[in-house]
């Protein structure tokens, strides 16, 4: 089974990758992350220990998504969960839409092309 984890270096993505590896299922895991958050580099090193092949890129960029290997399942853990969007001066509402909507659409289109399954973990922004 080939699994692609987006947001692999984030809190949820890295924990999921570790759990899959610990289950001993023999799944081939590819992680995809923009490495933009604090702690991403630490998680990157940890993922390598679990056999996750990490690809650096941006799911908002179609060419980055197109360069990813085919998968049987895509688990979309990538998101910008900022509840302070627009208020913190660092994250705009547009950036949230690009990450959380356009990026997800790119992954859904990849699933359709490859006939892969899809799991969306979503964000705290769905309330």
Feature locations, PLM:
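N-terminal Rossmann-like NAD(P)+-binding domain of SDR-like oxidoreductases, especially those catalyzing
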Residues: 1-127
